[in-house]
A protein has these predicted regions:
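C-terminal helix-to-coil terminal segments
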Residues: 2-4, 14-15, 19, 91, ...
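Rossmann-like adenosine-cofactor binding region
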Residues: 63-66, 177-266
């Protein structure tokens, strides 16, 4: 008997029709999010009404919402993070939760290095000046010999580290869950404070559910540090980041994730902040692979 599945990521199937075509082979009732945005918490219960299976995005699946979805049996996430899902509730109630950790690695790593190069080489300002017919030349910075501190050294963190090393950067990392004996010895494991003190560039790739960079951490950093975050919005205290960017203690930043999305905060007023709308995984190959894996994960779990 064919069953109902809900698909909540608003971009699902836009890059390739293959994931949706595969679902149609097994489900005759497919509910798609056509709003173009994340489903708000107030609408999740209605959207999930009477379904056993979901291809999930970043919608709120806390216990207060899951408790109103007694039919739900499988949540298959398009993406890595599971912060939006109450995993204790799903475990206690025999709801399977799956994710797609592998496909995003290359895309997020590429985007991180793109941002690091753009900020280090002052690409944004050169482009802006020339479009204003200002022929301004200034000396920028190379990644060669720069100290890179990576917070979180899983799949993405390690790939980012390798990319930086190709440019001659010196890479150290902090990750309490990774044993250094399992990591290439070109990377140095350090304590969190040590990494902050020596970094020219800090790149966050952590699964921590805590704030990582606040006032105290910024005070430890070198002047002109570059901050990169494609991990979690709450990993950086936004007010502290704003103040340090404005004072030029931090030279610049790239932020792809925010506490509240869509983002409308004060960082948009700063020229030294590159802000992107949570699109590090938005390459054609990555989106298709993530969606296909999410579909296959769901089918395997049924």
């Amino acid at each position: 008997m064919k069953k109902k599945v809900v698909i909540t990521p608003s971009s699902f199937g836009q890059v390739s029709s293959k994931p949706l075509e595969k679902l149609k082979q097994y489900f005759d009732d497919i509910v798609i999010n056509n709003t173009g945005k994340k489903i708000p918490s107030s609408d999740v219960v209605n959207f999930y009404d009477n379904t056993q299976y979901s291809i999930a995005g970043l919608e709120d699946l806390s216990s207060s919402i899951l408790s109103h979805l007694p039919s739900l049996r499988v949540i298959s996430r398009v993406g890595i993070g599971l912060d939006n899902i109450d995993l204790k509730y799903t475990s206690d109630n025999n709801i399977k939760v799956l994710n797609t950790p592998d496909p995003p690695t290359a895309a997020v790593s590429e985007m991180t290095i793109t941002a690091a190069l753009s900020l280090s080489r002052n690409l944004i300002n050169y482009n802006k000046d020339l479009h204003m017919k200002h022929w301004n030349k200034s000396v920028s910075n190379s990644l060669k010999n720069k100290n890179i501190f990576i917070i979180g050294f899983g799949r993405i963190g390690q790939k980012v580290g390798k990319y930086f090393s190709f440019f001659g950067s010196k890479v150290c990392y902090y990750d309490p869950y990774i044993e250094s004996k399992n990591i290439d010895n070109i990377f140095k494991k350090v304590e969190f404070k040590e990494g902050l003190l020596q970094a020219d560039i800090i790149s966050i790739h952590s699964s921590s559910k805590s704030e990582l960079l606040g006032d105290a951490e910024f005070k430890l950093m070198k002047d002109n540090v570059i901050i990169l975050n494609s991990s979690r919005g709450y990993h950086i205290n936004e007010l502290a980041l704003f103040q340090n960017l404005k004072s030029k203690k931090a030279s610049s930043c790239w932020i792809d994730v925010f506490r509240e999305e869509p983002y409308k905060g004060d960082l948009i007023t700063l020229d030294n902040a590159i802000l992107t709308p949570h699109i590090s995984t938005y390459t054609k190959i990555c989106r298709e692979e993530m969606e296909m894996q999410a579909v296959q994960n769901l089918l395997n779990a049924i």
